[in-house]
């Protein structure tokens, strides 16, 4: 739903009654989730200079064939790449620091033609989780994401072994 709202330029209220998966968009959801999420995006990019792509499929190509995901938003402001994830569910707040999902997206995006532009020459990578009414932000470096990628490659290869140790979770 956020993709449609952001790319259309229309007011969120124009989407009332629309369905996303099994969720009907109501004024209450706009007030409690969508508007706070858009305000968070404005706080991240107050000058409206960010270039961004929404809902981009990212993957590791030949490094890890078949390993991919879909980012909510990949962007760039100055020397900072941005990886943003919308969390609209109620319940447990998701922490952003060292968040494996966001680091996965950043590492995969760096190897994906359609998203790598946001990381080229970046000296910082900001991870953002927007979980209205909360916004959590963490700035890291391309070097940290490269280390995460190495850890991920080792974990995937270990999991592919015939007698791989199983883990709950």
Residue ranges of predicted features:
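Metal-dependent nuclease catalytic cores that hydrolyze phosphodiester bonds in DNA/RNA
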Residues: 1-76, 80-81
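A cyclin-like helical interaction fold
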Residues: 33-44, 142-149, 169
């Amino acid at each position: 739903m956020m993709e449609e709202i952001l790319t259309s330029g229309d007011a969120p209220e124009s989407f009332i009654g629309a369905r996303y998966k099994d969720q009907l968009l109501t004024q209450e959801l706009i007030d409690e989730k969508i508007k706070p999420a858009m305000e968070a995006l404005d706080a991240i990019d107050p000058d409206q200079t960010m270039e961004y792509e929404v809902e981009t499929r990212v993957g590791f190509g030949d490094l890890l064939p078949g390993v991919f995901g879909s980012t909510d938003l990949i962007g760039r402001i100055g020397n900072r790449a941005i990886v943003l994830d919308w969390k609209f569910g109620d319940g447990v707040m998701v922490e952003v620091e060292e968040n494996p999902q966001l680091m996965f997206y950043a590492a995969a995006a760096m190897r994906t033609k359609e998203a790598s532009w946001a990381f080229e020459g970046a000296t910082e990578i900001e991870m953002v989780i927007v979980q209205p009414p909360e916004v959590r932000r963490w700035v890291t470096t391309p070097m940290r994401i490269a280390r995460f990628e190495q850890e991920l490659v080792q974990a995937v290869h270990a999991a592919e072994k015939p007698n791989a140790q199983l883990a709950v979770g």
